[in-house]
């Protein structure tokens, strides 16, 4: 049975309420996340929509978060949380969709819906071990002014995809096609 991530959003004068009350209860599988991770995802989604949002804790003060205890988005021990990347993208998606219903001009469509990660490991010529882990992009939803990105980073952070030249300089890898 699918696990529901549902958001009701209320915009007030200078504040908003993000209410996840209709979200599924925590589950036996590893896709649960903590309350703090949920709040961090909300910040990241809002930062993607409102570029001028500063990167400080004060930015969260006008936001009320309603996240039920022991839900998918506020799991308690011993519920597993190791597969959280899929769930955090759902939070970002529902915020994008909710805000696009408030004003279609402020939010783009959802991104590609999962995490594209590459993990490689090996030994250097001198015998030292190396491990490379990097996120790579995918397609993003469109917006009123045009199509979305065809190869953007997952909106799970405000980071960017590392330049391939940096990865090639740091690890014994060579990218021949991108």
Write out the residue ranges for each language-model feature:
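Glycine/proline-enriched, intrinsically flexible loops and inter-domain linkers
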Residues: 1-178
């Amino acid at each position: 049975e699918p696990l529901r991530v549902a958001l009701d959003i209320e915009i007030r004068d200078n504040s908003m309420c993000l209410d996840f009350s209709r979200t599924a209860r925590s589950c036996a599988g590893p896709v649960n996340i903590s309350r703090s991770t949920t709040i961090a995802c909300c910040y990241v989604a809002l930062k993607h929509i409102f570029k001028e949002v500063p990167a400080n804790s004060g930015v969260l003060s006008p936001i009320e978060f309603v996240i039920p205890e022991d839900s998918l988005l506020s799991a308690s021990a011993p519920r597993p949380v190791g597969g959280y990347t899929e769930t955090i993208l759902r939070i970002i998606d529902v915020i994008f969709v909710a805000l696009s219903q408030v004003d279609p001009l402020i939010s783009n469509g959802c991104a590609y819906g999962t995490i594209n990660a590459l993990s490689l490991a090996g030994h250097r010529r001198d015998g030292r071990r190396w491990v490379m882990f990097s996120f790579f992009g995918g397609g993003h939803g469109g917006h009123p002014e045009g199509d979305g990105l065809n190869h953007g980073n997952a909106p799970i952070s405000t980071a960017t995809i590392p330049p391939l030249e940096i990865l090639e300089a740091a690890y014994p890898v060579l990218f021949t096609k991108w």
